[in-house]
């Protein structure tokens, strides 16, 4: 009987101890504390993994604020840590953000291939954003981090991120099928401009290499031993609704999800000591916590507190991250 089963551990300890994981996504509705949770998870992982990378794919780039340190599109070591790195990417940048070295070649024609690829990719709806992720994935895989944590944008962007390997596989497949038709035209065009012949094979080899990496990533994303998703929510109707939608979409995409963080909870020790608003909020949260318990009885549900002060800076995150590993218990108030 299901009722006789022990409830799952209410923490993220299961993820930290699963050393086969390569990709961990953290996402949910805007304003629920995803960045604090993803940063805290990365800190805990850094205790047991050789090297950890946290990537922000949210255009707001809150991990710079969370760690109180400026990050860029290049992995940078987080202050106070030896093996934790962070980077921020713009998911809307597409190929414009790719490094120039990627397009370097022996002839001048190859150097114009960036513009050619951009035009070809623009003809395939939805692939521009996906290609940005694709190149990041290629770079990240080459760096051999033990585990990568994604601090994702609000739900809509997140679902596109999850789907990007399939989008890129389809798009690159189309590009490669088109190459034999397009290459002769390009060769004529560049010869008219007095440039050297365009080496179409060199260009298509780059696409082939990227497709190989993306196919590999796509397989890993659908492997629960290597990829999982952590949903972050608060105990309110709209957040719970968004979480259920996200869980269903992830399941449809074949992405593993078995951890939910409920953030910003009130832990009232004595209802007589609380103000009427706190008592009211506490009752509302209790109602939605009961619904979460019913909906996600086969999930690890981690409950995190609403704090008096914001969580900012490496030491503050390090301290808060302990709440991911063992259930939060409010400190007893000193007697007056």
Swiss-Prot record:
Zn(2+) binds at residues 275, 278. The active site is at residue 58. The keyword Cell inner membrane does not apply. Keywords: ATP-binding, Cytoplasm, Endoplasmic reticulum, Hydrolase, Metal-binding, Nucleotide-binding, Transport, Zinc. ATP binds at residues 29-36, 236, 263. Pfam families: ArsA_ATPase. Coiled coil: none annotated. GO terms for cellular component: GET complex. It is found in: Cytoplasm; Endoplasmic reticulum. The keyword Repeat does not apply. It comes from the Eukaryota. GO terms for molecular function: ATP binding; ATP hydrolysis activity; metal ion binding. It is an enzyme of class 3 (hydrolase). Its EC number is 3.6.-.-. PANTHER family: ARSENICAL PUMP-DRIVING ATPASE ARSENITE-TRANSLOCATING ATPASE, ATPASE GET3. Homodimer. ATPase required for the post-translational delivery of tail-anchored (TA) proteins to the endoplasmic reticulum. Recognizes and selectively binds the transmembrane domain of TA proteins in the cytosol. This complex then targets to the endoplasmic reticulum by membrane-bound receptors, where the tail-anchored protein is released for insertion. This process is regulated by ATP binding and hydrolysis. ATP binding drives the homodimer towards the closed dimer state, facilitating recognition of newly synthesized TA membrane proteins. ATP hydrolysis is required for insertion. This is ATPase ASNA1 homolog.
